[in-house]
Every structure is written in structure tokens, then in C-alpha cells.
Regions:
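Well-ordered alpha-helical segments embedded in enzymatic catalytic cores
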Residues: 51-55, 77, 103, 131
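Alpha-helix C-terminal capping segments
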Residues: 56-60, 74-83, 108-112, 136-139, ...
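Short, well-ordered alpha-helical microsegments
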Residues: 74-77, 129, 155, 185
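Hydrophobic positions on the alpha1 helix immediately C-terminal to the Walker A/P-loop
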Residues: 158
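Helix-rich effector regions associated with P-loop NTPase G domains
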Residues: 2-65, 69-72, 83-86, 92, ...
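Conserved ATPase-coupling elements of RecA-like P-loop NTPase cores
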Residues: 76-79, 96-102, 206-209
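A structural signal for isolated positions on well-ordered beta-strands in alpha/beta enzyme cores
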Residues: 66, 86-87, 119, 146
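Canonical P-loop GTPase G-domain recognition
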Residues: 94-153, 161-165, 173
Length: 326
């Protein structure tokens, strides 16, 4: 059985409409990965999490797990069964340089007790990759290392950077993009002294990225350092985040908020709005002091004081509150 070196799917020449199609079984990439890699043409694939969970359940609890999570979301799932987990917080380059790694590491430490290390990285900037690679080798004990995480968490980008930095250059790279579900099955990478296994990303249906078209995904995906937008607020008003989210707020004292999201988004403040998209649902939060609202896949809003907020967004998206990350 020959697998696509980009996404891990089994290669076939029978049906052009099915996954894994290629015109020649000698090709390294399926047609989907070839077009994505060479022309930036993305073909969306609708998957469920059955195969992902099947892979996770097949991994020994004693295996070393490298769990990647996007710094804007910090979504961490399916690690409870494993005894050795390194959490890798990706995309450090999109947060302001003033935000220290220790703040993020300590935040995760207080919430996840069964991790052996937490490393904040930027694959794009090569930041902390030597440190991470040494940690992986230290804990691997010559056994395969599994990389898991949600779709679009930076998993495949990290693997390609590891191939660039530490392999003998004969390894083929896995397919990467800003779009969800690029990896479709397990992809094994043999680095000589280390074997990595990339797995398909868990599809989080509460994440906005899984409900947008390609152009919208480009709009909400930060490509460079975020410039936080802050505002002093009092009384009632609305925060509009492009066409994706509306947040109505009500505070009885002076308050402030800071928005961490892509610089491409049109963000504005208005007096309390009444019109609501028919596809938007309302979620109400009564926030305590120093809490965030996270819009999965989009970013987060930091509030300083207590405040009541109503969040209107796509009915599939599930915003949530947490203690201030920053």
C-alpha cells in the first residue's frame, strides 16, 4: 500500500473524485496535495472524528505525545490517557513580543497536571525549536513520537521545520496550509535518531475556521504579529468583529478590554445594535474580574473588570470564558 507523503492517505488511480487520487502510482503526492503545494489550490474535505479517535485509541498510554495547540485558542483535548505529554504552544510569532513565555507556560501548568514539559515555539521564526527537539529526544527513549492536536494547530508546519533543521534532507515534507484537515491519515517521518508520526487533526466543530470559505479563512488567520486593540468602555455598547461576531456589553463601572485577533479584521465599536443575523446565536456571560472571552479560531478578548456580555456568532461556534491569559 502506497501512501501520499503529504497527507498520509492511500494513493489510488481509479477514481479522480475520491481521496488519494493520482494519475501515476509512482507519484509521491496525491492530486489534492500536489495542487495545494504547487498552486495553493485547496480542496475542502469533509471528515468526522471517527478515524482521529481510532488512531488516538490505538496509541499506547506509555507513548510520548507531542500535543500542538494554537496560542490564540489553547485548546487541549484527549491527553488524559497518556503518561508522557509535551504540550507545544505554536505560533508565538503572532503575539506581541512583550508577552513572555513563562506567563503562558504557568497558565497551562495550573490546568493540566499530567504533562512533562511545555514549550512555546514559532516554527516560522525557528524560535525554541532546538529546545523542543532536545526535549523530544530526551523523553522518546528511541520509541516513535506521536504528534496530535486540533486541525490548523501548526502540527504539520512544525514537522516540516524539524525535517528542515534536523534530518538528512532526504525526507519528503508533509503538506501544510492555513486550511483545516490537510493531514488525512498517519504520516511517518524517520529522522534516523527519531521517528515522528503526524496524525490527522481533531476537527473542532465549535471552531469558526471549520465554517468559513477559503477567503474568510485568510481574513481571520494572523500572518504576522498581532497589534492588540484596546478600548475603555462604560455603560452599554457593541463591539463588532468584522462580519463574524458581535459582542454587546453592559458595565456599571469604568472598564477596559483588549482584542487579540488578526490585523486584517475590521473591528469597530458602536452603540448597542439591534439587528442580528438569522444564523447567529446568542450566548450570555457574566464575567468576573480578569477574564477572557475566547472565540475559537478567531481570537480572544481580555476584560479587566466584571461585565455582562452577549455574544452573537454563527450557531456552530461556541465561545467560552476563562481567566485572563495575559
Amino acid at each position: 500500500m502506497t501512501k501520499c507523503l503529504g497527507c498520509g492517505i492511500e494513493i489510488q488511480t481509479i477514481s479522480q473524485n475520491d481521496l488519494g487520487y493520482t494519475s501515476n502510482l509512482d507519484n509521491d503526492l496525491c492530486e489534492r496535495c500536489f495542487k495545494l503545494k504547487n498552486y495553493g489550490k485547496y480542496t475542502k474535505v469533509t471528515l468526522d472524528n471517527y478515524d482521529y479517535l481510532k488512531i488516538i485509541n490505538s496509541i499506547s498510554e506509555n507513548s510520548l505525545i507531542v500535543y500542538t495547540t494554537d496560542i490564540l485558542n489553547l485548546t487541549i483535548n484527549n491527553i488524559d490517557k497518556f503518561k508522557k505529554v509535551i504540550i507545544v504552544v505554536t505560533k508565538k510569532d503572532i503575539l506581541p513580543k512583550s508577552i513572555k513565555d513563562e506567563k503562558i507556560i504557568n497558565y497551562i501548568k495550573t490546568r493540566y497536571k499530567n504533562v512533562i514539559d511545555i514549550v512555546v515555539i514559532s516554527s516560522i521564526k525557528n524560535y525554541n525549536l532546538d529546545h523542543l527537539y532536545n526535549k523530544i529526544k530526551q523523553h522518546a527513549n528511541n520509541n516513535p513520537v506521536y504528534l496530535i492536536g486540533n486541525t490548523n494547530s501548526g502540527k504539520s508546519t512544525l514537522i516540516n521545520k524539524i525535517i528542515d533543521n534536523y534530518s538528512n534532507k532526504s525526507n519528503k515534507k508533509v503538506t501544510t496550509s492555513m486550511y483545516p484537515s490537510t493531514t488525512l491519515d498517519k504520516v511517518e517521518i524517520d529522522l534516523g535518531d527519531l521517528k515522528l508520526i503526524d496524525t490527522p487533526g481533531l476537527i473542532d466543530n465549535t471552531n469558526i475556521i471549520n465554517h468559513l470559505d477559503n477567503k474568510e479563512v485568510k481574513t481571520i488567520t494572523p500572518k504576522k504579529e498581532i497589534k492588540p486593540k484596546s478600548c475603555q468602555i462604560n455603560g452599554k455598547g457593541s463591539l463588532i468583529i468584522d462580519k463574524f461576531v458581535r459582542i454587546d456589553y453592559e458595565t456599571i463601572t469604568n472598564n477596559s478590554l483588549v482584542i487579540y485577533a488578526s490585523n486584517n479584521l475590521n473591528i469597530r465599536f458602536n452603540s448597542l445594535k439591534k439587528e442580528i443575523s438569522k444564523n447567529f446565536n446568542n450566548t450570555e456571560f457574566n464575567l468576573k474580574p480578569k477574564q477572557d472571552i475566547v472565540i475559537p479560531g478567531l481570537g480572544f478578548i481580555k476584560f479587566v473588570g466584571p461585565i455582562k456580555v452577549n455574544i452573537y456568532c454563527d450557531k456552530n461556534i461556541k465561545p467560552y470564558s476563562r481567566d485572563n491569559l495575559i
